[in-house]
Amino acid sequence: MNATRKQRLWLVIGVLTAAALAVTLIALALQRNMSYLFTPSQVDAGAAAGYQQFRLGGMVKAGSIQRATDSLTVTFKVIDKHAATQVEYTGILPDLFRDNQSVIANGRMQAGRFVANEVLAKHDETYMPKELKDAMAEGHVGKPIPAAAAPLSGVR
């Protein structure tokens, strides 16, 4: 092997190593920033157990909102057709947050409850994002849930 071929070989090896390193770093960065959406039924079934941070989506159970008198801490239940998950959030809630409202909370499970660091409320109680509608429809036996589904008030 002459000097030119050796030089090209080392150049190709260096470029391939740099590309592999770049792909690995990008994959790790994307994996840390991904936030999967789960419903309360999926959380109860243990589907979210492997994730430190995830999104919880569903409806705010009527009458479950409790505000602390001495802080901005709010607790409430997020429900779907089959389950409910207790959520704790410290901060200012969106103006559209209320009972029977579609909500997505970003956070983590801690001591049997979901501790949210962000809460997003939807514009209308009949609106449901496609991702949440699809996730809730998976656990629903029977007709699929339409995008303009009525709020769930009978789940405890």
Curated annotation (Swiss-Prot):
Keywords: Cell inner membrane, Cell membrane, Cytochrome c-type biogenesis, Heme, Iron, Membrane, Metal-binding, Signal-anchor, Transmembrane, Transmembrane helix
GO BP annotations listed: cytochrome complex assembly
Pfam families noted in UniProt: CcmE
Topological domains, Periplasmic: 30-156
Binding site for heme: 123, 127
One annotated GO molecular function: heme binding
Cytoplasmic side, ranges: 1-8
UniProt membrane topology term: Single-pass type II membrane protein
Subcellular location: Cell inner membrane
Gene Ontology, cellular component aspect: plasma membrane
InterPro entries, alphabetized: CcmE, CcmE-like_sf, NA-bd_OB-fold
Membrane-spanning parts: 9-29
PANTHER family (UniProt xref): CYTOCHROME C-TYPE BIOGENESIS PROTEIN CCME HOMOLOG, MITOCHONDRIAL
Stated role: Heme chaperone required for the biogenesis of c-type cytochromes. Transiently binds heme delivered by CcmC and transfers the heme to apo-cytochromes in a process facilitated by CcmF and CcmH.
Similarity comment: Belongs to the CcmE/CycJ family.
Record-given protein name: Cytochrome c-type biogenesis protein CcmE 1
Source species of the chain: Xanthomonas campestris pv. campestris (strain ATCC 33913 / DSM 3586 / NCPPB 528 / LMG 568 / P 25)
